[in-house]
Amino acid sequence: VTRRTAEGRPVRRAALTLAAATVLLAGCAGTTQAEPDRKPSTVPVTPTAPAPSGRTADGTLLVADFGADTVTFVDPDKGPVDSVKVGTAPYGLAVGEDGRAWVATAEGVAVVDTEARRRLALIPYETENLGEPTHGEYRGGGMGIALAPDGKHVYVGVNVPDANGTVETIDTAAREVTDVTPVGRRPFDVDVSRDGDEVYATDHDSFDVTVVDARSHDTRRIEVAPYGTEGGLGSWLKPHYAAVRPSDGKLLFPFEGEKLVVVDPDTGRSTIERMTANTHQHGVTITPDGTLLAVGTGPIDPAEDEGPSLTVRAPDGKEKVIPLDGPHEDVAVSADGRTAYVTGGFTRDGYWNGITVVDLGSGDTRRLPAGERPLGIAVL
C-alpha cells in the first residue's frame, strides 16, 4: 500500500476537524455526553483458561482492564494466567523495580504486588468533583501515570469531567497523596524527566503539555498543536501520549502518522519531523537506544487515511510501518527489544479483548487474548 505523507495532501483544517467529530466516532472529541454502550470488535481471538496463581515469571505482561475492575497477568505465549481486582475502569499503570504496580483507576491509585498477585492498597484521589466511579472514556479519575526514577513518588493525571484536570503526587512509602497540581484537560499521559526533576502531563483537550516542577510543583504550559487548535473540544488533532527521548530529554509527540512534534521542555520550543504511517495515533513508547514506537489506531477519514499500524522509528528517523488488524491503544516492548505488545482495548469503539504480539524484526504479528478492553501495559 502506498502511504501518503503530510507533504502529499492538503493540511487539515477546521472543516475536517468538525466533520470528523460529527460524522465519525466521538472518541477523541472532548464531550461529556453519556456514551452509548461500547461494542468490541468481532474479530475473534482464541481464549485461554487462566492458569493457577503462582510465581510471576519475568516477561509476563500486565494489562489494565479498562472495561472491568481488574489488571490481568498475561503469558506472552499462551494468554491470561491470573487477574487482580484493583478498582473501576483502570487506565494507565506503572511498575517499579520492586515489582509493585501503580494502577490509575476511577476510584484511586491501586498498589499491586505483582509477585504475590494481590492488591496492597487503594489510594483515593484528593481532587474534587470526579463524580461516582464509572466506566467510559470521559469518566473521572486517573488516566496517565508514571513513577519517579528513584521510585519515591508516583504522578497520576486525574481527569475532572467538564473541567481542567490535575496531577496528584503520591509518596510511595507512605502511600498517600502529598500534592495536587492543576494541569490541563484530560491528562491522557504522564511522563517524568530522566533526572526526576520535571513531570510532563499531556493534556489532550487543552492541546498542550504541562511541565510540573517535581519539587515546587510550579507549572508551565507548552502548546502542542501542529494543526492548530481550530475545532476546540471537537477536534481530533490533539496530543495523546508522549515519550521522553533518552539522548536529550526532549518530548516526542506523534500526530496522524504525518508529524512528529519534538518539544524542548526547557525552552518550550518545538520542531516538526516527517512521519509516514498516515493514520490517527495514540500510544507511544521509546526504547533505551531511542527507537520510538507509535500506535496507529486507524483513519479519521477513510478516504484519506490508512488503517491501524505500529510505527517503528529508528533514532535516525527511518520508519518501518507494520499493519495491525483493528484498533489498538498502547504499546510496550520486551526486555530484549525484539517484540512489541500492542493493546487492543482502545478508548473508542472497535476495541477488542486482547493484544497483538509484533516481531519487530520480521514484522510478523499474532493475536493473543488478554483481559477486558486492555489499555495500559507493562512488561514485568
Model-derived regions: residue spans:
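Predominantly soluble domains enriched in secretory-pathway, periplasmic, or organellar proteins
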Residues: T22, C28-L380
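Secretory targeting and sorting signals
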Residues: V1-A34, T42
